[in-house]
Structure formats: C-alpha cells, structure tokens
Amino acid sequence: RFKKIRRLGALPGLTSKRPRSGSDLKNQLRSGKRSQYRIRLEEKQKLRFHYGLTERQLLKYVHIAGKAKGSTGRVLLQLLEMRLDNILFRLGMASTIPGARQLVNHRHILVNGRIVDIPSYRCKPQDIITTKDKERSKVLIQNYIASSSHEELPNHLTIDPLQYKGLVNQIIDRKWVGLKINELLVVEYYSRQT
C-alpha cells in the first residue's frame, strides 16, 4: 500500500495515509523522463487502486462507459463513484473502500430496506442506504462515523448520522469526485490497448 501511494500520490479510498511532501520530488528526480505510456498507465493504476478494482473489472467499466452517451471519461467516473462500497466510503460510514466492501460482504448494509451483499451494486438517485437493525452493525457504523475526518460531503449524498442513514440525491458531478485524476488518460490507455 505505502509503495503505491508513494509512487502514485494520495489514494484516499485505499488508505488514509498521505505520501510525504518530499517523496514526490525524489520520485521525479529518480525516474527521469516519463513517457506518455507511463503517464497513462499511472493514471489507470491510480483509478484501479483507489477503487480497489481488478484489471478485468476496470476494463468492464471502461467498455460500459464507452457504449453510454456522453464523455466516456465522465461516465466511467460516474459508474465507479455510484458503486455501493464507494458511496459508503464517501458517506463516512467506512474509513476506506476495502473497509466498506467488507461491511457490504458481511451483510451489514441495506439499500431501500433490502440487504445488499454485492459491493459493486450500482446505486441510483433516491436510494436510501441504512445499516441492519442489529446492535453489532450499528456499533461498527457508529465507530466509523465518529472517527471519520469530517470532510465536506459531496452534494450528491446526504447523511443522517443519528439514524445511520444515507441518501443518494443525484448522480455525482465531476467536480465532487474525491480523487485527483485525468480520466481521459485512462480512456486513452485502454483505447490504445485494443
């Protein structure tokens, strides 16, 4: 993990750790001239590690985004941001995306009153995300909410920390994506692979 954040920069979905301020400069000095391929590859890896996806999963999302209307890069980010594990992370109900994935896999999360145990479940506007009515589930979420660094909540989400309830208001806007990334380079990377 730490090698990844040292090489790629801050990945809030993977870990709350940040690279040291001088490590960026050392990396650039050591690496010399970066080729266009390497720049595209690093952007793709940043996206992959932040959202915790395998190469195959990311490729699937790129294909879906390519077939959809609108900018492929923007649609790709919307698809990734609207995953249930990512929404839990952005709501502050989990400290990292892998932590959110574990909550979903262990059946602690309900979407619109139904248990969902698929982390890649695509949330839609007006979805209500709550915890199971069990004490253990509520304690887990309560600890995460209490320890979460109260960053500004994106405008497409609303949370009620007392009822352990989150609401998806709308599909995310590009400016609220929690990662500094050039998604066009990721799309370019895959378009050159085929």
Swiss-Prot record:
Residues covered by the S4 RNA-binding domain: 82-143
Stored Pfam families: Ribosomal_S4, S4
Keywords: Chloroplast, Plastid, Ribonucleoprotein, Ribosomal protein, RNA-binding, rRNA-binding
Source organism superkingdom: Eukaryota
CDD domains in alphabetical order: S4 (cd00165)
Signal peptide (UniProt feature, chain positions): none
Subcellular location: Plastid, Chloroplast
Record InterPro entries: Ribosomal_uS4, Ribosomal_uS4_bac-type, Ribosomal_uS4_CS, Ribosomal_uS4_N, S4_RNA-bd, S4_RNA-bd_sf
Gene Ontology MF terms: rRNA binding; structural constituent of ribosome
GO process annotations (BP): ribosomal small subunit biogenesis; translation
Subunit (UniProt): Part of the 30S ribosomal subunit. Contacts protein S5. The interaction surface between S4 and S5 is involved in control of translational fidelity.
Protein purpose: One of the primary rRNA binding proteins, it binds directly to 16S rRNA where it nucleates assembly of the body of the 30S subunit. With S5 and S12 plays an important role in translational accuracy.
Family in the record: Belongs to the universal ribosomal protein uS4 family.
Protein's name according to its UniProt entry: Small ribosomal subunit protein uS4c
Species of the source: Trimezia steyermarkii
Gene encoding the protein: rps4
